[in-house]
Amino acid sequence: VHVHLDLPMFGTVSSDDHYTGTKAAAYGATTTVIDFVSQDSDELSACIRDLRQKADRRVAVDYGLHMNITHWTDAIGEQIPGLIDLGVSSIKVFTAYNDRLRLQDSDIFRVMRIAGEHGLLTMLHAENGDLIDLLVKEALSVGHTEPIWHARTRPAWGAVEAVMRGAAIAAEANAPLYIVHMNVAGEVDMLEYARSKGLVVVGETCPQYLFFTESDLEKVDAAKWICSPPLRKPEDNHRIWRGLKNGTIQVLATDHCPFYYDGTKPIA
């Protein structure tokens, strides 16, 4: 339910396209994947059409699509109800990546309100973009480019705050919410709290947040362990495991978005 195939990013493209990614899925007995449509224009139907034209002739399994909303205008809002007729019933918004993906809270509210009124599900990438930008700037100013600083500049508490903020916005919008790639113990606590207040909030995590920790970002080959959000501490892994076991977290996805390590498709 959460993959990124043939995704342009940081001057390169993810290494799995719609053929190789879905072929690998089939080998692993996965018969359906759900990819994301980038909002490359203000015509959402055109964004969906362009991706389908590229993917339809190459996929080896069934696939579905989520729609990223990364730029807001009233005209975009008017198009959201029509997404269902195009086979897209879920939208993703971001509270991070300030320079290219993040929506302001007021715009996230607008998206959620329309989605809730028309039976669409809003997915949320929950991190604190302002804190990340500041910490990255400070780290770079003193020369910290080691992989471990990917985790140190994306604070866990920022993710916890963003989950609670997203839940609060969803409550005000009277809309269901799906939190993607949860990786912090406090996020699970916030999910439980939101549910205790009657909110419809779904939690998702990924295998990397169950089996690996930020100590892997200090290995010789640490670049191989970079993912976003980053790997966390063992106590976070343990809480995520408990959340899966007791049903607080309902979805185990992959967030599959690989890049070649050997420089075949270098990241700028």
How would you label these PLM feature ranges?
Residues 1-8, 58-60, 212-225:
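N-terminal small/glycine-rich loop or linker at the start of catalytic domains
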Residues 4, 37-39, 68, 95-96, ...:
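Short, ordered loop/turn segments at secondary-structure junctions
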